[in-house]
Design a protein with these regions (language model features):
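Intracellular juxtamembrane helix-capping segments at the cytosolic ends
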Residues: 171-186
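Transmembrane alpha-helical segments of major facilitator superfamily
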Residues: 106-117, 198-199
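Juxtamembrane intracellular "pre-TM" segments in multi-pass secondary transporters
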Residues: 3-27, 67
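Extracytoplasmic gate region of multi-pass secondary transporters
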Residues: 20-61, 73-109
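Structural signature of the two symmetry-related core transmembrane helices
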Residues: 135-149
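Helix-loop junctions at membrane interfaces in 12-TM secondary transporters
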Residues: 152-162
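Helix-to-loop junctions at the C-terminal end of transmembrane segments
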Residues: 119-132
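A membrane-interface helix-boundary motif in multi-pass transporters
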Residues: 209-226
C-alpha cells in the first residue's frame, strides 16, 4: 500500500507498532466506550423522561378528546425547562416541535440534550484557551459519573436534568480522545486514525447491553449503570 506522499505503507508492521503503543491502544478503548456511552445515553432519553415524568399518566388524565393546546399546557405544567422550550417554540412559530403525545414530550428532552451538547462544544473550545484539554476532559468525565449516578438514583425532574447533563459532558470527549490517542504516531497516523474511527462500534455493543439490563430489571433507571 502506498501513502499520499508515495511512501510505502506496511500494514502489518504498522499494526504491530500501534498495538505496542499503550497510549494509542487506550485511546481506542476509551473511544469505544465514549461512543457507546453517547449513543446509549441518547437512545434512552425519550423513554427515561416518559417514565420519570409520567407523561402517559398526565395525558391519560386529559382524556382522548383533549385539544392540542390542552396537551401542551398540561405538559408545560410538569417541568419548567421544557415549559420554556415550548414557549420558545411558540414564539418562533415552531409549532411542529410542540408535543402532542407522551413520546413527543419525551423527545423534547432529547432535543434539549443535543442543544446542550452543541453549546458545551463551543464552551469547551473557549475553555481550552485557558485550561489544558486533558484537565477539562478529566473534569467532564468525573462530572458525567456524578450525573450518571443522579440519573440512576434520582427521581422526577432531577433525574432528567442529570441525564441531560451527561450529554453536555460528552461534548468534548470524541475530538479530545481522538487527538490524544493519535499523538506521536507519525507515519502511522492514517491507519491509526481509521481504527480510532472504527471504535464507534461501541455504540452497537453498549446500547444492546443497556437494553438487556432494562428489560431484565424492568427499570430504565437501572439500565444507566452500563
Amino acid at each position: 500500500e502506498t501513502g499520499e506522499k508515495g511512501e510505502k505503507v506496511e500494514f502489518a508492521a504498522t499494526l504491530r507498532r500501534l498495538i505496542r503503543n499503550k497510549n494509542y491502544v487506550w485511546g481506542v478503548v476509551a473511544q469505544f466506550f465514549n461512543i457507546g456511552a453517547q449513543i446509549a445515553v441518547w437512545s434512552f432519553v425519550i423513554r427515561y423522561a416518559m417514565v420519570q415524568l409520567d407523561f402517559d399518566g398526565v395525558l391519560a388524565s386529559l382524556g382522548d378528546s383533549a385539544s392540542a393546546d390542552a396537551v401542551v399546557n398540561a405538559l408545560r405544567g410538569i417541568e419548567p425547562v421544557a415549559a420554556m422550550f415550548y414557549d420558545g417554540c411558540e414564539w418562533f412559530g415552531l409549532d411542529d416541535l410542540l408535543p402532542r403525545t407522551a413520546e413527543q414530550a419525551g423527545a423534547t428532552y432529547y432535543i434539549m440534550s443535543l442543544i446542550l451538547f452543541v453549546i458545551m462544544r463551543f464552551v469547551c473550545t473557549v475553555m481550552m484557551k485557558y485550561v489544558r484539554a486533558y484537565k477539562i476532559l478529566i473534569g467532564l468525565a468525573l462530572l458525567a459519573v456524578i450525573f450518571c449516578l443522579g440519573t440512576m438514583l434520582g427521581k422526577g425532574s432531577f433525574g432528567v436534568y442529570c441525564l441531560m447533563g451527561i450529554s453536555g459532558c460528552m461534548s468534548l470527549m470524541f475530538p479530545t480522545i481522538y487527538g490524544f490517542g493519535l499523538t506521536g504516531l507519525g507515519n502511522d497516523t492514517k491507519i491509526g486514525g481509521s481504527f480510532m474511527v472504527m471504535a464507534i462500534a461501541g455504540a452497537a455493543v453498549l446500547t444492546q447491553i443497556q437494553g438487556i439490563v432494562s428489560d431484565q430489571t424492568g427499570s430504565i433507571m437501572a439500565a444507566y449503570v452500563v
